[in-house]
Amino acid sequence: MSERFFSETPITGPRAELRGAEAHHLTRVMRAAVGAEVTLFDGSGQEFAGRVARIDREGVTLDIVAARAVNRELAGPLHLGVALPKGDRQRWLVEKATELGATRLVPLICERSVAQPTPSARARLERFVIEATKQCGRNRLMEVAAPSTLEDYLATAPAAARRLFAHVPDDPSGSAAQTTSLAAALSQAGHAPNYETFVAIGPEGGFTPTEVAAAHKNGWQLVSLGPRTLRVESAALALVAAIALRKRSDEED
């Protein structure tokens, strides 16, 4: 059985417990019995070989057979600030950002935001992260941060980090001359492979001219993703994928 299961409780001893959805998946969906061997992770960066020792109404108890540190993270943190779209598109965005290696997702509150982040929505996104992490093999969870205003997100990103602000260059803000292509921005020298990256993606209606001016004032680099208008989730994943590939290329050089 090659399925991976997430332990909400840190695994520090010879046994682990699965409860709730994870226990249900293991026993009801996978039909695991006592003696079945599975892979566990707890978000610490390690993964564990476990063997089912007991199944009862409370959940599943597993013996920890082995622990191993397996690093499948990007070299350097990648923070994805994005004005979330509505509905199921949120799930798709979160799943793919997790698979591509984003470290943290920050729901942005912008002037034209269409989806307002709530505590229940955040809990739902965190569950999407767990499911995607199980599938893709990461041993650390992408953090779903508390919602942030765009102003705070722009101001708190360290000046030493690479800060990329997705921008449509032909808008009426007058900032076309300040915008560069994503490829050109990522090819610029001056960053080690483990550099920290912050990305900002606007809502369906785009960033307002005031927001674009604030990004430029705070030292963010305005980047274009090409001549086509992309939906929020497409723009977010285009940026994350390009950055992830660039980081891998820098590691190999």
Where are these regions (language model features)?
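Structured adenosyl-cofactor binding patch, chiefly the S-adenosyl-L-methionine
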Residues: P209-D253
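Active-site/ligand-binding-proximal alpha/beta "capping" segment
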Residues: R163-A214, W220-S224
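Residue-level signal for inorganic ion chemistry
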Residues: G35, A97, V129, A215, ...
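N-terminal positively charged helical leader segments and presequences
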Residues: M1-A69
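A generic structural signal for short beta-strands and their flanking turns/coil linkers
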Residues: P14, V34-A36, Q46-F48, E58-V60, ...
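N-terminal-biased segments
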Residues: R28-G59, E151-A189
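RNA substrate-binding interface of SAM-dependent RNA methyltransferases
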Residues: V65, N71-V168
